[in-house]
Amino acid sequence: MDTIDQTPHRSYEVRTYGCQMNVHDSERLSGLLEDAGYTKAAAGQAPDLVVFNTCAVRENADNKLYGNLSHLAPAKERNPDMQIAVGGCLAQKDRDVVVKKAPWVDVVFGTHNIGSLPALLDRARHNQRAEVEILEALEAFPSTLPAKRESAYAGWVSISVGCNNTCTFCIVPALRGKEVDRRPGDILAEVQALVNEGVVEVTLLGQNVNAYGVSFADPDQPRDRGAFAALLRACGQIDGLERVRFTSPHPAEFTDDVIEAMAETPNVCPQLHMPLQSGSDRVLKAMRRSYRKSRFLGIIDKVRTAMPHAAITTDIIVGFPGETEEDFQDTLDVVRQARFTSAYTFQYSKRPGTPAAEMDEQLPKAVVQERYERLIALQEQITLEENQKLVGAEVELLVAAGEGRKNAETARMSGRARDGRLVHFRPEGNLDGTVRPGDVVTVVVSAAAPHHLVADTPVLTHRRTRAGDSFEKGVTPKTPPIGVGLGLPQIGAPAPLPVQMGCNA
């Protein structure tokens, strides 16, 4: 990669929109920039560089980006040395359109070449013109780049990039490319590196995690349909790793071995986020979702048999083209049967470039809004009822930062239970000093609401952790590049992982 010749201590700010993939990519961008000599801008400081890591999934993504870019135009005019970069899915989609709409932007880069950002910034500054570089295929796994992690106690670990599905409403495969899987050994090495830094919770990321193992980049790594279940079990062998989560699985490829691994691996959390999208078989077919509601509900039954207290969450789209009232009632019926702990609900958003955008029978906004409100009302009722079942229960929390908007006025702190539920608690009782984000407490739930639980009873136990120590010091992990490029010959093999991790590397 090109080196960057720049004034020392240029400050940066990364603004992230969209999914967990983007959040994790932004950690990579921060790591790259800090390796190139930038420092993160302090709160309230005008940065020398602003990087937008964009999303293209929602209809208003374009308006949000270009509106924010227009707000920066006066700052750029006042300070011509300031640089603005736009990356992510919307940049991959819009390409040269970005600098046509916002000519004060210095760099546009895509989803496949985030590692080029420092060099592109240097080139734009040297050439005094915008640099637009969009690649059609992934240049290197993001894991081969350094990362400046946002959290002292929880970390993202990407197991794959891209997606082989062809959902008619989704533009992500066109922007992220076909699925490419990382080697198990590289993934576990990254997890171990995070744990070595004090991280206690890891979330494995992929557009379709259950497909992991069928698209390895390394030609010497054989296809393995059981690779994801083996990966979960291998994570269970890492000392100091207390919680493992993953997102997102696809119902069409959800297999029994994964359910068994979840139930039998103690540090894999009793939580499953599995997108439904619609409860109508007719709509699922139009979406090209390749499963039907009976299969979806069957998976939930198996998960609850293996893990009776598992919290199951989902994604639902309301108002897909051609959705009838009968179709919508099918969705409500699945919601009633599944009794999701919570649901991320969306009104269908037409995305240019997707098959659904060209479908007939696009629904009126008023119809979609009315159905959306009915779905929200039903799901909130179910969520409250499910949360009320936990009143009086003892739960273990990983204390979190920034999860409670009213914590200052209520004198509470917040944490996540093992099943992912948000709990606000009073840091009083059997404490071992000050409670910090990253510490672990045990509390008894005293009240329930649709979006959270409350524990106003005294804390039963408090365990201080290395993650809490790091948070208190203001230190977050900075993980080095891990793994090799996409099928390229590697120079030297990584150190072998312990045999008991149980996953072929």
From Swiss-Prot:
It is found in: Cytoplasm. This is tRNA-2-methylthio-N(6)-dimethylallyladenosine synthase. Its cofactor is [4Fe-4S] cluster. Residues 388-459 form the TRAM domain. CDD domains: Radical_SAM. Binds 2 [4Fe-4S] clusters. One cluster is coordinated with 3 cysteines and an exchangeable S-adenosyl-L-methionine. Monomer. Its EC number is 2.8.4.3. It comes from Rhodococcus jostii (strain RHA1).
